[in-house]
Amino acid sequence: MAVKVINTDVLIIGSGAAGLRASIEARRQGVEVLLASKTLTGVANCSIFSGGAFAAAFGTMTKENHFRTTITAGKLINDQGLVEVLVDEAASRLLELQEFGVKLSIGNGSCRVLDGSFPMQGAGLIHPLVKHARSIGVKMLENTMITDLLGSGIVNGAVGFNALNGERVAIGANAVVL
């Protein structure tokens, strides 16, 4: 069986919230983006089954309280520099999700995604992100199992196969996001 060869600027592997958000940001930078998903985009990931709740400095929750809560929950082994970035950006990044069609309910120190239901509370996050990513030109490679990364010292692509028909695929990319 022949190998299908695809080239792109940015290959993103995984269609959970992180992969979708990364694909949207890369596309906003004007590059060609290919999002590879092992099933239909946005279906088989932890984000869709998440509770759809986030902590951030909203209402009476200050950034200092958010920082302390996060460090305590992490049993003091967190990378405090990364926690500072999280605390500084959490509220604005959560509000930014509304630009992509995500409906939010914001309370004191928390933010919940609406439009999800058990067992897929995170559907209210994932489905709008998939829709937005498609609308801005993110290309989707669905039902594709990525089995290996390409490159020696520097990753410049990946290989895998279509889970439905067995077709093999090789993807060349200037950047790869896992």
Model-derived segments and spans:
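Short coil-to-beta-strand
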Residues: T62-H66, I171-L178
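N-terminal Rossmann-like FAD-binding beta1-loop-alpha1 element of flavoenzymes
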Residues: D9-L35
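Mobile, glycine-rich extracellular loop/lid and propeptide segments
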Residues: V10, A17, V159, I171, ...
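N-terminal charge/polar-biased segments
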Residues: M1-V10, A17, K139-L141
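Conserved N-terminal/central alpha/beta ligand/cofactor-binding core
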Residues: E25, V31, K38-N162
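Core beta-strand elements of the Rossmann-like FAD/NAD(P) dinucleotide-binding domain
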Residues: K4-T8, L164-A175
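A generic local structural motif
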Residues: M1, R21, N162-G166
